[in-house]
C-alpha cells in the first residue's frame, strides 16, 4: 500500500473524528464518510460532525475517578475530542460538560484545517473490499451497513440491543451474608456468589421492584422485548411468583447456614478474571439509576453495594469484539478492516473516543508496516481495550470505564485511597508506554 493511499473512516461521530485527527497528525490522508445531512438516524438532528445525541456531559473530571483518569490519558495523547471539550466546557461542578454546538463546531474546524482530509457526505452501505477502513458508525448504525457488517462478521456476532445486568464492585459485597455455590453443586466450591431470601423478604423485594421508576423510552427506541432478556421488573410484573421460576429460582441451591433450599436466590457471577467485579445474573433492567441503588441494595449482601455499571436495555448496535477483533482493533478475518467507538462494545462518549484514538494509532502503525503496541492494562485506555478484546465472548456486554476493569493494585489498599493510587499508577504507566513507543520510531 503506497503512502498516498487515503484511509477511509466510516462515521463522523466522536470515534471517527478522533481517529481521523490522530491519523492526520501523523501525515496520513483520510477520507471521512458521514451520511448526515443526506440521511439522518432517528436520534441525530445536527448536520455537524461529532454530534452529542444524549447528554452534554462527559462525566467526572476528577482524576481519582476512572472516567477522569481516562480523560487525562487522552489529553496526554493529543486527543481532539478532549481539546474540544476543555475549550467549550460549561459549569458542571466536578463533571466536564460542554456547549454541544460549540463543541461540534470546534472539532469540525480543527479537522478541516488539514488539506489531507476529504469529507464525503453520503451513506456507506457496503464495506470496501480493499484499502484500510475504520468502521466507527456507532450505536445507531444504518440497517444497510449493519447487514454488510453482519456479512463479514456473521449474524450471531452482531447485536442490536443491550440487555445489561448491573455490575457490583467485589469489595463492596458483604461476604458474611452471601455463600459460594453453583446449582446442584455438591462440594460447595461453586462459581457463583448466592444471596438468599426468605418468603417475607422476597415478597417485599418483589413489591418494591414492581413499583420502581423506569427510564422513559427515547424517540428512536421501540422495544419488542425478547423473552430471553426481559427486564427484571417486566418479569416481576407478570405475577408475584414469576421471578421464582426465572432469575431468582432457588432450585439446586442449598444455603449452608440452614442446610435447606432458600425461598429465593439472587446469583452474582464473576465478571472479570481478577474477580474485582460481579454481575447480578439476569437482572437486566430499565429502572433508573437511583432506583437500582435503592432496590438492589435490598438484596442480602448488597446493602452497601457500589455499582461499577448500572443495568440497562437500549438500542445499541455493537459487535462481539472478543470473538472478532485483535488487540489492534483489526478484524481477525480481514486485516484491512478496523473497528472503533461504541460499535466495539464500549459504552459512553469518552470510551468511544478512546477507542477511536486507539484505532487511529493502530491503523497508522499498520499502514507503515509496523505492529501496534497497545497501552498496558494498568492504564484506563489499556483496560478498555482489554475488555473488548480479551473478555469471555459468551458473556460479552458493553461497559463504561471503571476501576474494576483495570489490573488490581498490589496489596491491601484503603478504599478512600484506591482511586488516587489507580490514577497515579495509570498515568505513570501511560508515560512509560509513550516513551517506549516513541523510542521505536
From Swiss-Prot:
UniProt keyword terms in alphabetical order: Cytoplasm, FAD, Flavoprotein, Methyltransferase, NAD, NADP, Transferase, tRNA processing
Compartment(s) of residence: Cytoplasm
EC number: 2.1.1.74
Chain residues that bind FAD: 11-16
Pfam families: GIDA
GO biological process: tRNA methylation; tRNA wobble uridine modification
Bilayer-spanning residue ranges: none
Main location: cytoplasm
Listed GO CC annotations: cytosol
Matching InterPro entries: FAD/NAD-bd_sf, MnmG-rel, MnmG_N, TrmFO
Role description: Catalyzes the folate-dependent formation of 5-methyl-uridine at position 54 (M-5-U54) in all tRNAs.
Protein name as catalogued: Methylenetetrahydrofolate--tRNA-(uracil-5-)-methyltransferase TrmFO
Gene: trmFO
